[in-house]
Amino acid sequence: PEPIVKETVMSKLQGSVQIPEEFKFAENITFYTMLRNIFRGKNILVTGPSGCGKSSLGKILAGITNKEFYSFNFGDTMNPSAKLLGDTKYDKEAGTWFKPSRFVNAIQSNSFIMLDEVTRDRTGDLANILMPVLDGQKYLALDESEDSDSVSVNKNAFFYATANIGREYLGASHDLDRAWKDRFTGGIYELEYLPKQKEMELIMIRNPQLDTYNADKIVDFAKRVRDLHSADELTTAVSTRMCLAVSELVVDGMSLIEALKHTCLPFYPVQAGDDSERVRVIQVIQSMGD
């Protein structure tokens, strides 16, 4: 008799869910592993360079898993506790009262909660507040007192965190400590920029009117600049987000050279009279016209 093949969670996902066209993975198994972890309620952390698609991937995964999407960005606040917990308000008639945050409401439902740029918190409050939310305790204390009211986390709430880690990200911690990492039992995914062919496919899917010639030139430019960045000759790289911006300008009628200059040169300013980085990038841009 033929051996019985046991159907697993991974095989079911691979047989029933198509990889989204609007996002490209270097390896398809990454996508299905993420879906498996969402299905199992295992929080995941995605790291990688700015503009490689971490945040847009969160929205895509929320849609596929039919969860309500909430995003909380920690790069735009100096008070994480107010963003996560809420604020005390005062009204002449009602007196003092507590207004819960969006986060308090989000964790009580079947939601996909994106904790964006967690390494941008320099107060230390973020980790302290979120530890019991992300681990087995599954609760959020509304203040720091011992008898604080708390909110239980819905068993179907899922947490997806993103982090930019590295010297080039202003205000970002160098790394996440071990206690933080241990809370993401679904694993830590290190996204990199896509291989040239897949990045080209992505920008052509996002901008169907873009021709193959210009798509190839855009991703070739990005690869050359990234190689210079990897060799420590530039302090920052060209992101996929920047490639998409260039492609949109080209589709709208701007020349490729002008679109590259308009989008990319502001990331390489002249600093204290030193224009060496800008000159290098301009040279790469000009070579795209050859």
Name the predicted role of every residue range.
Residues 1-216, 220:
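AAA+ P-loop NTPase catalytic core and its hallmark functional loops
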Residues 1-25, 40, 195-290:
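Alpha-helical lid/collar subdomain of P-loop NTPases
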